[in-house]
């Protein structure tokens, strides 16, 4: 075989391989989409009942503020530890 024939066979093999891969991927996408639609049709997600929204009260705001006050020293210590370990201070 001449180099031109070998090159032509290589191109032919490459294109047929790419065609098979694209065909397989398209079939795979179609199968996954079809299975998803079937599962959603026969096993729909239950509809959750929405609870009436509760307005934040003074107590919940105080608890959130208290959480921030408790976490502030922890955050400062973590930042200081990180800076020490990185040699930034």
Curated annotation (Swiss-Prot):
Family as reported in the entry's similarity comment: Belongs to the OadG family.
InterPro entries in alphabetical order: Na_pump_deCOase, OadG
GO biological process: sodium ion export across plasma membrane
Subunit structure: Heterotrimer of an alpha, a beta and a gamma subunit.
Database matches in HAMAP family: OadG
Lineage of the species this protein comes from: Bacteria, Pseudomonadati, Pseudomonadota, Gammaproteobacteria, Pasteurellales
Broad class of the protein's primary localization: membrane
Protein's name in the database: Probable oxaloacetate decarboxylase gamma chain
């Amino acid at each position: 075989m001449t180099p031109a024939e070998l090159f032509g066979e290589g191109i032919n093999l490459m294109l047929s391989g790419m065609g098979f891969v694209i065909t397989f991927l398209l079939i795979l996408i179609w199968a996954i989409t079809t299975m998803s639609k079937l599962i959603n049709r026969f096993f729909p997600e239950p509809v959750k009942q929405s609870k009436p929204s509760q307005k934040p009260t003074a107590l919940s705001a105080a608890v959130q503020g208290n959480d921030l006050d408790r976490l502030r020293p922890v955050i400062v210590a973590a930042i200081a530890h990180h800076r020490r370990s990185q040699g930034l201070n």
